[in-house]
């Protein structure tokens, strides 16, 4: 008690020697009990670019894996080929791809933040450094922001591209990051709207819908190249990070 400075002691003369006198240091004690802090958890889901569940595309379009083209080029019907799940690069001039991410882990929690990142660029025949495209992300049918990509990037080889991929083709993209926060939605750290993470209703359905594409009324309808973990500059697929309590 002395070490905790709750009391102090003094020695006083007594009838048969000395006695120890205990004196309190404080008149009142206030005891505060901390509320248990909710532990935050993070779930990371990597979605291969060929694992789309729905699409609407128009030429120029195609799919490749690390070995070769999957079916022919510029034929939207080829996007149904079951080998699409091995795809490492997907491209299309118009339309969208839709993915479904699992949400079982957040059913009993509260989502604080969702982050989605992917390597992207425009789509032109071969490549074209002057080819803008307004690439939009939708999450559960709500717009999460549009990035105007300036180019279908080429002119130097993508760091991960296999040797057989020709130099005249699209080579790399830019890594773009959309973030859903409690106070709004951000693209590469810049706020794009006031739609909060709760507004996307991430746990309401059986999955989280993610759609990447170009609007039919977009100013720059320059298509999309979507890179997997073996093409372009970044060794990743479409990556979703969910922070929840």
Describe each PLM feature range:
Residues 10-35:
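Short, cationic-aromatic polyanion-contact patches
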Residues 98-112, 197-203:
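Extracellular and analogous surface-interaction loops
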Residues 213-245:
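Proprotein-processing/basic-patch segments
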Residues 77-92, 150-203, 220:
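Extended, solvent-exposed segments with strong compositional bias
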Residues 127-139:
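Short coil-to-beta strand junction motifs in C2/discoidin
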Residues 29-85:
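Amphipathic alpha-helical dimerization/coiled-coil segments
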Residues 109-129:
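A short beta-strand element within beta-rich, extracytoplasmic domains
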């Amino acid at each position: 008690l002395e070490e905790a400075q709750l009391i102090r002691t003094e020695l006083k003369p007594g009838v048969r020697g000395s006695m120890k006198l205990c004196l309190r240091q404080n008149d009142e004690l206030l005891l505060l009990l901390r509320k248990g802090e909710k532990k935050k958890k993070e779930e990371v889901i990597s979605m291969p670019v060929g694992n789309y569940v729905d699409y609407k595309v128009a030429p120029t379009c195609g799919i490749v894996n690390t070995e070769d083209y999957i079916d022919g080029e510029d034929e939207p019907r080829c996007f149904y080929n079951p080998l699409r799940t091995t795809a490492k690069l997907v491209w299309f001039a118009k339309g969208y791809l839709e993915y479904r991410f699992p949400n079982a882990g957040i059913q009993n929690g509260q989502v604080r933040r969702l982050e989605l990142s992917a390597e992207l660029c425009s789509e032109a025949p071969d490549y074209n450094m002057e080819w803008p495209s307004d690439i939009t992300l939708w999450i559960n049918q709500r717009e999460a922001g549009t990035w105007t990509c300036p180019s279908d990037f080429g002119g130097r080889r993508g760091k991960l591209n296999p040797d057989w991929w020709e130099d005249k083709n699209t080579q790399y993209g830019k890594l773009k990051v959309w973030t859903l926060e409690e106070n709004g939605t951000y693209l590469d750290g810049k706020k794009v709207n006031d739609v909060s993470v709760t507004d996307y209703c991430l746990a309401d359905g059986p999955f989280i819908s993610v759609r990447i594409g170009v609007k039919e009324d977009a100013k720059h309808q320059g298509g999309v190249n979507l890179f997997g973990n073996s093409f372009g500059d970044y060794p990743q697929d479409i990556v979703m990070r969910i922070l929840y309590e």
